[in-house]
């Protein structure tokens, strides 16, 4: 089974900044789905299950690419594990949103969501993500997660190590420290 991991360093779904890569993801998802309508599962853990973020995902992938969009809410206990497992079983691609990376990884490990994502990846489900959803797969990630808690702006943190490299998201122009 071919495995695909698509990492989007930054951008905004709502303003269509990522439309070219979204189109690429949609094409892959449709191939994965075969004769069925493609199904995309949005994971908004890093944004603490922000529903407006999911609505932007749904609007883009449903209206532009005709993909069934769904969401897995886990931060506040809205969905049972069995319901989330059903959604993972249907997914042609999983899209991990941006936000607080360190919180997201801690939450995934605590709740078992990481195991579901790993199993989906192993069976050929396309995994993609933006910002926190992109950098989490790397050995080392340069993230501002601690700034949410009032600490320094950017620091190196250990990621999941699926990609043996280091990443810095949202890089446009080098800034002087």
Task: List the predicted regions and their residue ranges.
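Mature exported/compartmentalized surface modules and terminal targeting/interaction regions
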Residues: 1-2, 144
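N-terminal beta1-alpha1 cap of cysteine-dependent amidohydrolase-like domains
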Residues: 2-93
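Structural motif
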Residues: 7, 93-97, 128, 167-168
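Short glycine-rich anion-binding loops that position phosphate/pyrophosphate groups of nucleotides
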Residues: 11, 46, 99-102, 133
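Short, glycine/charged-enriched secondary-structure capping and boundary segments
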Residues: 20-22, 55-57, 108-112, 142-145
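Short, surface-exposed connector motifs at secondary-structure boundaries
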Residues: 36-41, 99-100, 163
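Flexible gly/pro-rich beta->alpha loop and the following alpha-helix that scaffold active-site loops
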Residues: 69-126
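Class I SAM-dependent methyltransferase SAM-binding "motif I" and its flanking Rossmann-like core
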Residues: 106-107, 114-176
């Amino acid at each position: 089974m071919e495995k695909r991991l698509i990492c989007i360093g930054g951008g905004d779904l709502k303003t269509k900044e990522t439309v070219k890569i979204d189109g690429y993801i949609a094409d892959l998802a449709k191939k994965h789905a075969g004769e069925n309508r493609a199904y995309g599962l949005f994971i908004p853990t890093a944004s603490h299950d922000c529903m407006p973020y999911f609505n932007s995902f749904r609007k883009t992938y449903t209206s532009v690419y005709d993909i069934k969009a769904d969401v897995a809410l886990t931060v506040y206990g809205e969905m049972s594990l069995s319901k989330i497992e059903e959604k993972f079983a249907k997914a042609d691609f999983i899209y991990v949103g941006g936000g607080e990376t360190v919180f997201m990884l801690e939450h995934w490990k605590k709740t078992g969501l990481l195991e579901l994502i790993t199993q989906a990846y192993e069976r050929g489900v396309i995994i993609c993500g933006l910002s926190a959803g992109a950098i989490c797969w790397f050995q080392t990630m340069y993230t501002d997660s601690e700034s949410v808690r009032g600490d320094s702006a950017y620091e190196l943190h250990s990621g999941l190590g699926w990609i043996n490299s280091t990443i810095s998201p949202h890089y446009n122009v080098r800034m002087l420290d």
